């Protein structure tokens, strides 16, 4: 039954990608935000998220936390809608939406052939960090968590390897060995600090 559900999810996402690609970047991103806010709470119960925010003392009151959760879902909706346009970020058609700060630091890393660890989190379109680093000339490998939906995971892996970062490291024990291999080859590593890793 899970395979059937995954297949239908895959069909829905592929259909949305097709529609978003027809709408153009800005319109698709804005509509994606609305879709995220509308359907996000159906995917994951807001009560647990609100409870976690309160436990972490984030937001002054319930209203503030509700706004934060709504914006979170909107952000995920935008990210979903922007996947069909990742290739355009790569080939500079959408570069006007990206501001790269610290280019001199990247130039130093390249010039001195340093191996460093780039750390970010799931802010806005988190895929763009690795894309911009590799595009700037950094020898890079990025750690990723495979999706549970194996139908959709193949699509996402293809997008990541083709347009974001050629060297993708699957999190876990085997990934730990790959990280060491890339570091020995003087590659830098990109990772998300808030990524769930229970092994390796």
Regions found by a protein language model. Give the residues of each.
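Membrane-anchoring hydrophobic helices of lipid-metabolizing enzymes
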Residues: 1-120, 155
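Soluble catalytic domains of membrane acyltransferases
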Residues: 87-200
